[in-house]
Amino acid sequence: MALIPSLGTSLSGMKTAQSQLSIISSNVANVDTEGYTRKIAQQKNVILAGYSQGVSIGEVTRKVNEGLLKSYLAANSLNGNLAAQNSYLSKTEILLGTPEGENSVSANVAALQTAFDSFASDVTSSAGRYNLLNQADTLTSRMNYISEEIQKLRGDADMNIAADVDEINKLLDTLDNLNDQIVKYTLLGYDGTADLLDQRDQALRSLSEKMDITYFKRDNGEIVVQTTNGITLLDNDPHYLSHNAVAQASPTTTYAAGGIDGIYVNGEDITASIKDGSIKGLIEVRDVILPSLQSQLDELAGALKAQINSVHNQGTAYPNTPSELTGTRTFIDPDKQQIKIAEGDVRFVIFDTNGKQVATTSLKGGIGFDSGSISEMAQEIQDWLRSADGPNLPQAEVGVDKNGKLFINTGDSNYTFSIIDEAGSAAGTAQQLSLIHISEPTRHAQIS
């Protein structure tokens, strides 16, 4: 009769060995499976009536270093952040082109400079004039295109933030469901939680790629997930994120000004609290990197405009001078807005129908105006135009129109005028007309 218990003991040993081999085989087969961890089957002695009746498989445990896992989550968040930024930096690199590329801004600026040099050698050349206008149009079109694309990229980044928020909410649902299963199996003493724990760790990895997180475990096997700033994302139930993507971005559409929606949890805006992950990278792209690029582009455009206008205003109209001009700058309150001519001067020359000079003066040296309001300056110029010591044009008018634009009109089409900047002794002082934005329309180099 002792043979049967002995056979039972041997059989249990064989079954236990078979189970262990199955687990080892699974470990080998899944060595390259993402999220899979090594499983270890614990053997336990079977006691019946005080006697050993063989062995059986006990709890199947995982070989996991929890500290290493948390370090991985932090590194994964940083990687998600940098990957998101790199994706958009690659797009902007393509947009801007290489310095030596034909469509780059630097190449367009160089082409405009060449066109200016060529036209300066023969200002009567129609071909040179056309080429100059064409190169200026190419440059401005290119800069406008880049500006539009920058704003599209900002809008795309915000849409990707919304997509990441949706993905995070799905991952929180997954973690919540796995929590429930793990807690249930743990309380009932069922085996089989190891694979569920693997799935939960994999969900944590995916979540950490989107934003910076940390977690802690409760005795029942449940985990609580928070941001690294302590904002709860999962505690018994998910705390969902929300974000409404902007329909269309523009340079004035910003998160700081309220034009772009924040990222909310339980009604609290956590945008500034997100420290890492792809969402942080996208926020950086949308609110810092691309706006900085836009600012640099605007600065370049402003510098080009100021420099070209400054040089342009040192010349005169060709071939015909005008009898009236209207500026491009808008003055909101010309009675209070001030202008000061620190260096250099502005010369006014009046011509008759034969192109003969009939009168000339300068704003500072002749008229005697070096500082004051826009209205005061306009009155001084008008007084000179009407005076007997000047061109004696009683119908002449100088002022600010209903649109806030400064205008000069001789009041007699038989008399035209030219305005020329005169540089002072200091470098870079021939810029007075740029201050009031008066320019002659037949000067083809004008950018306004």
Task: Give the location of each predicted region.
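Structural signature of extracellular appendage/secretion-system components
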Residues: M1-S439, R443, S448
